Amino acid sequence: MRLFFTPSMSNLSIFFSILLLSLPLPSIGDLAADKSALLSFRSAVGGRTLLWDVKQTSPCNWTGVLCDGGRVTALRLPGETLSGHIPEGIFGNLTQLRTLSLRLNGLTGSLPLDLGSCSDLRRLYLQGNRFSGEIPEVLFSLSNLVRLNLAENEFSGEISSGFKNLTRLKTLYLENNKLSGSLLDLDLSLDQFNVSNNLLNGSIPKSLQKFDSDSFVGTSLCGKPLVVCSNEGTVPSQPISVGNIPGTVEGSEEKKKRKKLSGGAIAGIVIGCVVGLSLIVMILMVLFRKKGNERTRAIDLATIKHHEVEIPGEKAAVEAPENRSYVNEYSPSAVKAVEVNSSGMKKLVFFGNATKVFDLEDLLRASAEVLGKGTFGTAYKAVLDAVTLVAVKRLKDVTMADREFKEKIEVVGAMDHENLVPLRAYYYSGDEKLLVYDFMPMGSLSALLHGNKGAGRPPLNWEVRSGIALGAARGLDYLHSQDPLSSHGNVKSSNILLTNSHDARVSDFGLAQLVSASSTTPNRATGYRAPEVTDPRRVSQKADVYSFGVVLLELLTGKAPSNSVMNEEGMDLARWVHSVAREEWRNEVFDSELMSIETVVSVEEEMAEMLQLGIDCTEQHPDKRPVMVEVVRRIQELRQSGADRVG
């Protein structure tokens, strides 16, 4: 039997052939193209440190690569020592990218123009490289961009009006480049903006005046929030007068007068210099003689200051080498408390039933080491004898009178809870204020999370982390229960200390009330501070809840809030977690160390519940945050439900 094709059947077959050719290729083909582009990228930028298994068909399990719907949607390679120029033809194939993070590398040259092919790109983080040239116009076609960070590069040229096309943009960081010209009114709904340390001039547009001065420092810009502009738009460097105009008679005569000094003027200058030098020599001789005649038994603080170690962001306590104390070479003690002279000394004041096994003399004689410098002063570990260790905090910026100090510190000393570091004693004089606490052998939670993670430090599993969270929450709940206005005022991981069994003890409670109102000490807990707090001495209970929520997020992510640059491209930790939780990639939030040791599904469910609690605690509006008693209840319930699931 023979088959005959009629003209209509022939047309129909052609139609279906064209239809098949017009259909999109299977996703596996697109993913293969993505993989090829990623390998080309790695080869071009020296990514030998990227341990990608090229034998895998899919790149979705590679470090820094995230897929969705069979395509690569995110590439996050911060701090991977990448270097060199990104060639054209790579991003043109990664067309489904929504997040690209190449920050803190050594990439150079201009941005590839095919970056404009990534029309779905929402977050672009390129800060901390050496990209140069003008910001390419193709970026302004990426209408879905929400976060753009080009800071810490070598971009030049003017800030283009093309930025106005990025109508969804919320973050724009351009600081520390070589951008020049004036600053345009971008007319964007920006939440974060910075153009500091560029070659910009002119006035700051009204729409950008809502940002603080830090966003514009290191430029020649003027206007709110910087200095007021003159009528011409810039402040002249010197007043213009006839005498300053070259070629005028007055100007020439003035120059001649300035060129010549009379003999009397010269003699006066010489005599003045000799007399001044003589006075300086006499003053120095008196000072040295006075210092040599001083006879006190105090410890010279100037010597110990050489041993004090600054802890960046207060992330960790200082660990001294074994059997070594930071002691003053002229005295057996390293804790400088008071000037002890022949007229006698004041005594330590102990609280409640605290065992008085030592006095101020013992404290002065004790060998000690610096633990770290905190918001309210320097902490020392004092070794009184073979079995007695205490922590001594030497307060700074406390200027209140004896009676007021006594009233406030007695409130602190009366606090008694198993999850608080007990205040055992204090010393007060006009020049020195000392607080004596129990010594916590495991140091702080901050040190445990962000300190040395060598072979000697076991990984922190979820049971330990959630237990620390519960203990700290109970301590704060106790503080809040004492009075409706009672708060900690400085909640952060470095103020959560640990016993040998990892039981949490909250420290530094009540000390915010002691700091002088005129203190210029910078607030070192910015990453923990609630947005409504303007005075560190007046912190509400709901602000404590916010700070504790940041600690919860810190436990879950392993990230330090004080290091804002590392917390997802310049956002603080709380906002970063809020944003990624909305995008539903929670598994990328959790600490990789934690994920590597926890394989039980129930644990991940607990972690997700704790993440939600951390998000609730860090709500922008105080009324939306839970109270501490509710926080304690929720942590108890999620820990109990986890125990029930595993039997």
UniProtKB/Swiss-Prot annotation:
Knockout consequences: No visible phenotype.
Would the keyword Transmembrane helix be found if you checked this record's keyword annotation?
A: yes
CDD domains xref list: STKc_IRAK
Q: Which residues carry this modification: Phosphothreonine?
A: T388, T520, T618
Tissues/organs with expression: Expressed in root tips, lateral root primordia, stipules, and floral organ abscission zones.
Which molecular function GO terms apply here?
Answer: ATP binding; protein kinase activity
Give GO cellular component annotations, separated by semicolons: cytosol; plasma membrane; plasmodesma
Keyword Transport tagged: no
User: What gene is behind this protein?
Assistant: RLK902
Name under which the protein is recorded: Probable inactive receptor kinase RLK902
Q: Where is the Protein kinase domain?
A: 365-639
Species classification: Eukaryota, Viridiplantae, Streptophyta, Embryophyta, Tracheophyta
